[in-house]
Amino acid sequence: MGIKHLYQIIQENAPDAVKAGEIKNHFGRKVAIDASMSIYSFLIAVRSDGQQLTSETGETTSHLMGMFYRTLRIVDNGIKPVYVFDGAPPKLKSGELAKRFMRKSEAAEAHEEAKEVGTAEEVEKFSRRTVRVTREHNEECKKLLKLMGVPYIDAPTEAEAQCAVLARAGKVYAAASEDMDTLCFDSPILLRHLTFSEQRKEPILEIHLDRVLEGLDMDRKQFVDLCILLGCDYLDPIPKVGPNTALKLIRDHGSLEQVVEAIKSDPKKKYTIPEDWPYKEARELFFDPDVRKADHPDCDFKWEAPDVEGLVKFLVEEKAFSEDRVRNAAARLQKNLKTAQQSRLEGFFKPIAKTEQEKAVLKRKHEEKLELQKKKKKEDAKAKKEAKSKPRGTT
C-alpha cells in the first residue's frame, strides 16, 4: 500500500527532490529492486478479457513473462539489478494484511457477478483487485532469476527495508519500488517506474530523501511521523485527517506525541484517534526494521552468465514460451551484463557536503518559491471568483 498522498506532498512542498528521466540515464548503476511489488505489477498486467497470461496448460505465466522481459529491458540499458524478496511480515502489519485479504475476497465475489452482468471495464477492475502474489509465484521468479544470472536476496521481513540498507551502504545506487514507504526506511534514493513496461512511456522518477527533508524542513523522525499520520501499512490514518491537515499538524506540533496530545485535549473534539493506534511501535518498525546488515554474507551478490539451456528447459519446455525469443533474449542478457560492468564517472568522485551557509540560502530560496506559489494560487482563486460573479455576456 505504501504511504497515502506522500508523493503529492513531496511534489507540492519539495519539487526539487524529484527528478524525472529516461531509463538510460541509469547506465552503469546497481539497483536493489523490491521483487514482490514488481511481481504484483506483472500479475495485474491482464488481457482485455480480464484474464492473466497463461500457458497452454492453464498455468499463470504473467509473473514470469514480466520478470523475464522487464529485467531484460533493465539490463539492456546497462543497469545491474539485484532483486529483494519479502520475508515474514511484521506482526503490526497483520491487521493491514487481513484487511487486504478481506478486500480481495469481496472483489472476487464482485468479479464473478461482473462477469455475469457487468461491463468489460467492471470485469477488469475487479479482476485486478483479486490478484495476490503467492509463494509459488515468488519461487518461480527466483528460479528464473537464478537461470538468468541475476542475483536476489531474501529479506527477513520487508523488502523495502532491506533495499534501503543496501542503498545506504553504497552497495547499490538506489532502491527501486512503487512503495513510497521505502523513504521511511531511510533509503537515500528511491526509483519509481523502473520495472514498468516500455509501452507505458512513464519516466523513471528519482526521489532524493535529503532534498525531501530539506524541502519539508523536517528531520527524519518528523518525516516518519508525517508518513504514519498520512496512513501506512502498519496503521490506519486518523479519520478526517487528510494530507494537508497531517502536514500542518506535524509542522505545528513537531512530533506525533504532541499531535496526539493536542487532538485529545481539543475541546471541540474535531478528530478522534482510533482506539488501537500504536504509532510508537509503527515508528520503531521504520527506525529499527528486521534487516540483514550490508556486510552479512547473504548480502553478497554477483551477476553470473545466464544458463541458456536451463532457461530454454524452464521457459520453453515447461511454460511454453517461444524458443527463438528466449534464446535471443539470453544472448542479449549475456552481452549486456558484460557491458554493465563499465563504471560511471561519478563513482570516482565523492559529493561535497553543503556548508551551513549554503543550506540557509537554499532554504530561503525554497521558502520564497513556496510563498510565490501560495500568492499565485490566491490570485488565481480570486480571478476565478471574480469571473464567476460577472454577468454572462460582459467582458
Curated annotation (Swiss-Prot):
It is an enzyme of class 3 (hydrolase). The keyword Nucleus applies. Its EC number is 3.1.-.-. Residues 360-395 are annotated as: Disordered. One of its GO terms (cellular component) is nucleoplasm. Binds 2 magnesium ions per subunit. They probably participate in the reaction catalyzed by the enzyme. May bind an additional third magnesium ion after substrate binding. Keywords: DNA damage, DNA repair, DNA replication, Endonuclease, Exonuclease, Hydrolase, Magnesium, Metal-binding, Mitochondrion, Nuclease, Nucleus, Phosphoprotein. Mg(2+) 1 binds at D34, D86, E158, E160. The keyword Nucleus applies. Mg(2+) 2 binds at D179, D181, D233. It is found in: Nucleus, Nucleolus; Nucleus, Nucleoplasm; Mitochondrion. SUPFAM superfamilies: 5' to 3' exonuclease, C-terminal subdomain, PIN domain-like. Residues 122-253 are annotated as: I-domain. One of its GO terms (molecular function) is DNA binding. DNA binds at R47, R70, E158, G231, D233. Phosphorylated. Phosphorylation upon DNA damage induces relocalization to the nuclear plasma. Interacts with PCNA. Three molecules of FEN1 bind to one PCNA trimer with each molecule binding to one PCNA monomer. PCNA stimulates the nuclease activity without altering cleavage specificity. Structure-specific nuclease with 5'-flap endonuclease and 5'-3' exonuclease activities involved in DNA replication and repair. During DNA replication, cleaves the 5'-overhanging flap structure that is generated by displacement synthesis when DNA polymerase encounters the 5'-end of a downstream Okazaki fragment. It enters the flap from the 5'-end and then tracks to cleave the flap base, leaving a nick for ligation. Also involved in the long patch base excision repair (LP-BER) pathway, by cleaving within the apurinic/apyrimidinic (AP) site-terminated flap. HAMAP family: Fen (MF_00614). Belongs to the XPG/RAD2 endonuclease family. FEN1 subfamily. This is Flap endonuclease 1. It comes from Ajellomyces capsulatus (strain NAm1 / WU24). The gene is FEN1.
